[in-house]
Amino acid sequence: MRPRTTISAAAAAVAVVVAAGTAAADPLDEFGFGAAAAATAGARTATATGPEAAHHNPAGVALGIHPAVLVGWGYGAMRLSINGRDARVLDAHGTTMGLAVPVALGGGWTLGTGIALYLPDQFLARLQLIPNNEPHFALLDNDPHRAVVEPVTAVAYGDKLALGVGASVLANARSKKIVFDVGVVAGEKVGEAELDVELPVRLAPLIGLWARPHPRVRAGLTYRGQLALDIALDILANVQIAGVVTGDVLVSLRASNYFTPARFGGGVAIDVLPELTLEADLTINRWSAYPAAADLAVLIALDIAPPLVSTSLPVPAFTDTVDGKLGVEYRRPGRRTDVAVRAGGAWRPTPVPPQIGLTSWADGDRLLLTAGVGVTLADWAPILTRPIDLDLALQWQHVARQLTQKHIETVPGEAFSSGGNILHAGVSATVRF
């Protein structure tokens, strides 16, 4: 048997075949939590209260008057293309659920607890392996397709000041043992497998601060820590085919998926009129911490060993970005039913650098326009003892078209174009009790 040969994790011939493309952010960042927030482009740092605050600003879960439950559903049509053809990015659809329970402590103080949940319809998580040199939307392939869990707690003093903390919860995937035995015995194919994988929990901190410095002005600050699903898999294949090949192969994979950058955000809301509110948010995203491409190591101990060329993949070199969001809400109270009309817009610059090397990650600056309407069943006693909100939101995201050209004198590869649109519709209901 030949001595074991170590093939670098960055071996180009291997990386091109099975390297994992990481994804970014999460569904609630992409489409908002609740239809009211989605209709204002997610500009809710200063105005979110009750269940929707569990995601947009944890401090707001202590600002509600009554316990409340939010339930919603949304569908996002991913109309993206590469080289003028469908990029085959899966549509995103799932259920949002939120809870906020404020408890009066006396002396003007209120303690609140809450949670934000998102459950995709198709699966709890989607991990996809795409060759790094194959053009694909690295930030949109997976990120709308994972569960989100964000428990929070907050304390508020009247309607003047509130502070909230919590965590965004995810899990890693780490193998303790993955072994496959394959071979041929007496002319019959045989095989068996042993699998032992653990999913240790990871937490990213959530912090929110809210204040009302003026009766018509509200302001908020938020911080969320970096989060990712880290994959550490070691797969051992024992091969026994007498007279043909015997030995074993160890494949070791290290990768990150669902990368969500650390972010710091601030927002302000001004009640221009008692029935008209303008909202603005600004968010700094630390994309420069985006992890490197998948780290793959292969140890071969077979009677045959194909030669491979060792090389290195470049670091992603993502850049930090600043997102801006604007929202407006007009409320018209009625005798028994209140109506709210909302609109918003956002600008999300891409963190992906020019793809002139081995990798071919498609992306583009994004323009987001939103609109929606809400109805509050405010005074329907004795049928309803508490108000119920019913909201609808429509979103259009335009991913700017880009033409990417390679430096073919140093790195082989073809030019490609990318771009498209994302259309999203969502509904939600908030019930107080």
Q: Language-model segments: which ranges?
A:
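Bacterial N-terminal signal peptides that target proteins for export
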Residues: M1-A11
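Surface-exposed strand-loop-strand hairpins of Gram-negative outer-membrane beta-barrel proteins
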Residues: G42-T47, A77-A92, T410, E414
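Transmembrane beta-strand segments of Gram-negative outer membrane beta-barrel proteins
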Residues: P27-R44, A62-A77
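Outer-membrane beta-barrel porins/channels
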Residues: D26-A38, G94-F433
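Residue-level detector of alpha-helical secondary structure
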Residues: A39, A53-G60, L70, G98, ...
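N-terminal signal peptide c-region/cleavage motif recognized by signal peptidases
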Residues: A19-T22
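Outer-membrane beta-barrel pore proteins
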Residues: T45-T47, A54-P67, V101-G107
